[in-house]
């Protein structure tokens, strides 16, 4: 049975114009030029220090038209992205389209104008008019699936705090290109790869509890008989009594390390990622 979720946590932004591809190529971590028409990828927009001020899914319609699924929980991310657009033939427009998440059986009878396959079990449907679907899931379910897939997210609490590799973007889809040339923050991102400057990675953890910790807060790690705070929570959702977290920590953790939630002492265990963070 398919689960349909209204993804109200996103804005759909159209980027259009003869300079659209060139402009985005100089702004984003992914290789916009070599992204195939009809394809999508996670990508980041960084500040000059290489810290991410937005993280979103980019969809290429053509070299002159792109769509962005921009999370609403960031502070003016679109203003940052279009800061230099005045010097190019490119426009940004928020579209009033329906954004639907699909989990489970991908029903061929649901004909959306754009269908994005996220993985074997999930898709995003984009349509200018309401689709004939019955919503039987919620945003928490979608976030839970994102976390389980190791797909990161940013929020206002973590905006401009991390370079892309700290959230594993080097290992996800086509999120970072190390061969495309210059873009804002590129020097820091390249240094993290070629000089080993990045010492952090994002881990998925789970535990049974009714608590949902705040984004930007810490968990605790056991050191011999003591516990100390560690990491930064970047995503958190409690679904059916199980807490799922994405936490940025040192990338040299031992497999046997024990973790817990400071709020109630609940045991947290590291879950396997569907990709290698050493990519």
Regions found by a protein language model. Name each.
Residues 1, 41-55, 85-86, 106-113, ...:
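Short amphipathic beta-strand starts and helix->beta connectors
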Residues 59, 67-68, 114-127, 161-180, ...:
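The conserved catalytic core of RNA pseudouridine synthases
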